[in-house]
Design a protein with these regions (language model features):
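Conserved N-terminal segment of class I S-adenosyl-L-methionine
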Residues: 1-164, 174-177, 236-237, 249, ...
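Short, glycine-/aromatic-enriched active-site segment of Class I SAM-dependent methyltransferases
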Residues: 191-223
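Feature marks short, surface-exposed loop/turn motifs that line or immediately flank catalytic pockets
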Residues: 187, 198-200, 238-240
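A short glycine-rich, Lys/Arg-flanked "PGG" loop and its adjoining helix->strand segment in the class I
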Residues: 174-189
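A SAM-dependent methyltransferase catalytic signature shared across enzymes that methylate proteins
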Residues: 9-17, 218-235, 253-255
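A short His-aromatic
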Residues: 165-169
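Short, electropositive alpha-helical surface patch
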Residues: 245-256
């Protein structure tokens, strides 16, 4: 059954072309020729079964976990904290001191810990029990729940959803975007960051990572609009060059502020940006 490539979930097109095989999941990847959405697998049931077995076998962050430490000073954790510094600058005008934040996919906890330090009341959702047990020991104002997003069952309501490099792992993003509405105050904001498929001369190719979908900016916006969300912003980001770093260092030393507004990440265009960031709002009117 080819239900995942019978019609594009983003634009409705039926024009897909085979791209390559996902080497981790052992299923084909197809590309929608209209919106450039990359679709992993042909059968929804087959993909769900494969992903379930993969994560039950602790694949999630398996390789990275070997280099992680509880003080979060390892290379991966430091890079995630740097990413957070850029992301919080991007979203801060949509947050208040009373905002209740729901982070989907907390991982090792870098974002959750930093939000906790800023005194935001944040709840993290994380399927990896090892990560959950570690975070419960160090969080102060915030909390972490051991659950997959598919099995999430909580009575609380939130004002802001934070998803950093998680949305691309969802095999049924339309259902997620609709189902999560019951846990949110209306109106609410949603922040998503995902890898971009539109960067030219991209070394990544997306052939190894267990992503259910990989998005272009248009495809991501279409999926959100389809479920009633209003797009506030959609931008492309990437790492700074040495020149960017030097300019920013001079600015912080002399003027006590960043030269680039979202440093240590750079606001780029679709051809050069590695990642897509979207802020969307759901008002409950649709």
């Amino acid at each position: 059954m080819s239900d995942r490539v019978s019609q594009c979930i983003s634009c409705g097109s039926t024009n897909f072309k085979y791209y390559t095989e996902n080497k981790t999941l052992k299923v084909p990847i197809y590309i929608c020729q209209n919106c450039k959405l990359h679709v992993t697998g042909e059968s929804q049931k087959q993909l769900d079964d494969i992903l379930k077995k993969l994560y039950e076998n602790n694949f999630w962050d398996m390789e990275r976990n070997e280099g992680l430490n509880d003080s979060h000073t390892d290379t991966y954790s430091v890079s995630r904290k740097r990413l957070f510094l850029s992301q919080i600058k991007y979203v801060k005008k949509f947050l208040t001191k009373n905002s209740k934040i729901l982070e989907i996919g907390s991982g090792h906890g870098e974002t959750l810990i930093e939000l906790d330090k800023l005194n935001f009341q944040t709840t993290g959702i994380e399927p990896d029990l090892k990560n959950v047990e570690h975070l419960r020991k160090i969080l102060k104002k915030s909390k972490i729940i051991h659950s997959s997003i598919e099995n999430l069952d909580i009575d609380e309501k939130f004002d802001f959803i934070w998803m950093s490099h998680v949305f691309e792992h969802l095999s049924d993003p339309i259902s997620f975007l609709n189902n999560i509405k019951k846990n949110m105050h209306k109106p609410y904001f949603l922040f998503i960051e995902v890898p971009s498929v539109t960067k030219k001369k991209d070394y990544r190719k997306f052939t190894v990572v267990p992503h259910a979908y990989n998005y272009s900016g248009i495809a991501l916006q279409n999926v959100l609009k389809k479920t009633g969300y209003k797009i506030i912003s959609c931008d492309y980001f990437g790492p700074p060059t040495k020149l960017n770093g030097g300019m920013n260092k001079i600015s912080t030393k002399i003027f006590k502020k960043d030269y680039y507004p979202f440093y240590p990440k750079m606001l780029l265009d679709a051809d050069t940006g590695e990642d897509i960031r979207v802020i969307a709002q759901y008002s409950g009117m649709s």
